Amino acid sequence: MKIILWLCVFGLFLATLFPVSWQMPVESGLSSEDSASSESFASKIKRHSDGTFTSDLSKQMEEEAVRLFIEWLKNGGPSSGAPPPSG
């Protein structure tokens, strides 16, 4: 039983000597992939902010269309002869 314990301790010791980076060599400096991924990250942030703005604008336009439609209904709706608001 002591042999198994010592083998486990020795295995842990060896694991600390050979880290995971030993299996996959670390590239020195920035590669083109790194710079591309950083550009991609920046473009994703920009796209997200553009999408957020577009989403907010769409929501605001929908709310305005609903408000106009409700006003149209209050003012007589289809019986008034006026066409429904487009939007």
From Swiss-Prot:
The modification Serine amide is found at S86. Its main location: secreted. GO terms for molecular function: hormone activity; toxin activity. It is found in: Secreted. One of its GO terms (cellular component) is extracellular region. The keyword Membrane does not apply. Stimulates vasoactive intestinal peptide (VIP) receptors in high concentrations (>100 nM), resulting in both an increase in cAMP and amylase secretion from pancreatic acini, although at low concentrations (between 0.3 and 3 nM) it increases cAMP without stimulating amylase release. Stimulates the GLP-1 receptor (GLP1R). Induces hypotension that is mediated by relaxation of cardiac smooth muscle. This is Exendin-3. It comes from Heloderma horridum horridum.
